[in-house]
A protein has these predicted regions:
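Expand to "…catalyze enediolate/carbanion chemistry for C-C bond making/breaking, isomerization
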Residues: 1-265
Length: 265
């Protein structure tokens, strides 16, 4: 571990002890996380005694599921699941990669993140309840708000929150987990408390997953700030890591270019 990674580890240990952190999160989907980056995050996560969550590339992303199994992921999320049929494809893909025994240690959830998917809320929650492989829903507020034509600034507004609360009520009725993400910040604390009052299992920032009850904690704003600091350090670490790789052969490239110029003259 380098100095920055040790600082990231300290932030995660503090988050677990003081702010209700449950897991570190990465994405093969929107972030395009590479495997070497993923392994750095996994090491930090394990040393902090946290779980690890991974958003795969789609409902039937078999290779992503295989790599998730090899790495040892605790939460797997399928993005942009728009229909009950897509949800069945996700459950089938999980069953092909993870046998019944292996599924016991992993939670598989789908992202509900568009107004089109919400139109199928009842059927998709019923399908999730029926599928032995699946356990819940992740409500992605940013994409949902944009898909409904409301804009990103509406994520903490009444309209988007009402959609989340309806989803929460349905998940509670069926005994499903509900996780809320998308633009979670200190501005989200009041609406997170509303969600907890109905039904909420976890909420998440881009890189950190919290226990839902931490939304009611006195220092949740500090917990969210801590998560932002972690993400910033992660991005700086990622930038420097690839810059180092990019510079590895700089001297040899310079030498070969000069040699080529001499031989080609």
């Amino acid at each position: 571990m380098n100095t920055r990674e040790r600082k990231m580890l300290d932030l995660m240990k503090k988050g677990k002890q003081e702010f209700g952190y449950l897991a570190v999160k990465a994405e093969f989907e929107a972030e395009g996380t590479r495997v070497d980056e993923l392994l750095r995050l996994v090491e930090i996560c394990r040393k902090a005694d946290l779980k690890f969550a991974l958003k795969i590339g789609g409902c039937e992303a078999m290779r992503d599921l295989i790599e998730s199994k090899q790495i040892g992921v605790d939460y797997i999320i399928a993005p942009m699941v728009e229909s009950p049929y897509a949800l069945t494809k996700f459950a089938e893909a999980v069953g092909k990669v993870y046998n019944d025994e292996e599924q016991e240690g992993v939670d598989f959830l789908f992202n509900l993140e568009t107004i089109s998917a919400f139109a199928h809320l009842d059927e998709m929650c019923a399908e999730t309840k029926k599928a032995k492989e699946l356990c819940g829903v992740v409500f992605g507020r940013v994409d949902f708000s944009l898909s409904a034509g409301l804009g990103r600034d509406a994520i903490n507004g009444k309209e988007v929150t009402d959609y989340v609360l309806k989803t929460a009520a349905k998940c509670k009725e069926l005994g499903l987990d509900l996780v809320v993400g998308g633009g979670v910040s200190s501005d989200s604390i009041p609406v997170l408390k509303e969600m907890v009052a109905v039904h909420l299992t976890r909420f998440e920032t881009r890189k950190v997953i919290f226990d839902a009850q931490s939304a009611n904690a006195a220092h949740i704003d500090q917990g969210l700030l801590n998560a932002v600091h972690f993400e910033l350090l992660w991005l700086l670490n990622k930038r420097d890591y690839y810059a180092q790789i990019g510079n590895e052969d700089a001297k040899r490239i310079d030498m070969l270019e000069k040699r080529w110029e001499v031989l080609n003259s």
